Swiss-Prot record:
SUPFAM superfamilies: Barrier-to-autointegration factor, BAF. Keywords: Acetylation, Chromosome, Cytoplasm, DNA-binding, Nucleus, Phosphoprotein. This is Barrier-to-autointegration factor. The lineage of its organism: Eukaryota, Metazoa, Chordata, Craniata, Vertebrata. It comes from Mus musculus (Mouse). It is found in: Nucleus; Chromosome; Nucleus envelope; Cytoplasm. The gene is Banf1.
């Protein structure tokens, strides 16, 4: 599977205070929905990812329920966070 430039940029460095929209799979619409629910930074979404024990099915279902992410968006976001964790945790 090839990854987007957005994905590669995200996993290339520590997360810091990056906005939630910097995550692969999260565009303007999903970013706004997540922000409205308190997930304004990428690290807040990472926290949920970790609470769900990095489980792909649970995380993707949570993302769908929380902001309406489709299958590709949730898969891209999951892959981005998984790869970031592999590199930095």
């Amino acid at each position: 599977m090839t990854t987007s430039q957005k994905h590669r940029d995200f996993v290339a460095e520590p997360m810091g205070e990056k906005p939630v929209g910097s995550l692969a799979g999260i565009g303007d619409v999903l970013s706004k929905r997540l922000e409205e629910r308190g997930f304004d930074k990428a690290y807040v979404v990472l926290g949920q990812f970790l609470v769900l024990k990095k489980d792909e099915d649970l995380f993707r279902e949570w993302l769908k329920d929380t902001c309406g992410a489709n299958a590709k968006q949730s898969r891209d976001c999951f892959g981005c966070l998984r790869e970031w964790c592999d590199a930095f945790l």
